[in-house]
């Protein structure tokens, strides 16, 4: 996607402890001043390029299972960007257990998300820790500032999708959603 769009990456570095566990990006690195500083130090950004950040991507939870307070990440990164993507490949179960309150992209009540809040994307590989077939995944979108037009999103999505969809994979997403619905999700995440 970065190659196709011409985006220039500007990395936010996570911490790593002495056990080798990759931790979170420190909160101070998510603040507007830190983002501006790393952009100014980025050798890929020249004077003739608009250096305004437009999209942030954070892995949540990390591969080692550490998870962010998504609400806080949005508050901090919302000072710099209008769109946020949480890569939640291993974290599709979080909404279904109160222990993870505010620690996943689609936290809280969608009705509480204001049009002035950032647009949030979340991707979840439902085949990893939910009951979907291999390669199954979800994309969730909570619209806010600078939301992406649905037809534009669908066109971009279809560029990456197969012209021969595998209906058992699609059906497995429906099944995993049904399994997690209601009391089932809490029961399955309590064990």
Language-model regions: role of each:
Residues 1-191:
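Conserved PLP-enzyme active-site core in the AAT-like
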């Amino acid at each position: 996607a970065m190659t196709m769009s011409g985006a220039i990456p500007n990395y936010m570095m996570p911490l790593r402890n002495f056990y080798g566990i990759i931790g979170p990006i420190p909160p101070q690195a998510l603040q507007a001043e830190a983002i501006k500083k790393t952009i100014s130090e980025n050798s890929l950004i020249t004077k003739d390029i608009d250096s305004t950040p437009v999209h942030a991507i954070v892995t949540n939870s990390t591969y080692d299972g550490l998870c962010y307070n998504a609400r806080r990440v949005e508050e901090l990164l919302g000072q710099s960007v209008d769109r946020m993507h949480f890569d939640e490949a291993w974290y599709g179960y979080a909404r279904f257990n109160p222990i993870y309150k505010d620690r996943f992209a689609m936290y809280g009540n969608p009705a509480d998300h204001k049009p002035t809040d950032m647009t949030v994307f979340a991707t979840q590989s439902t085949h990893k820790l939910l009951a979907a077939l291999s390669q199954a995944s979800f994309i969730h979108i909570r619209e806010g500032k600078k939301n992406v037009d649905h037809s534009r999103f669908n066109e971009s999505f279809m560029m990456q999708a197969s012209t021969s969809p595998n209906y058992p994979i699609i059906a497995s997403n429906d099944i995993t959603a049904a399994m997690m619905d209601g009391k089932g999700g809490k029961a399955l995440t309590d064990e």
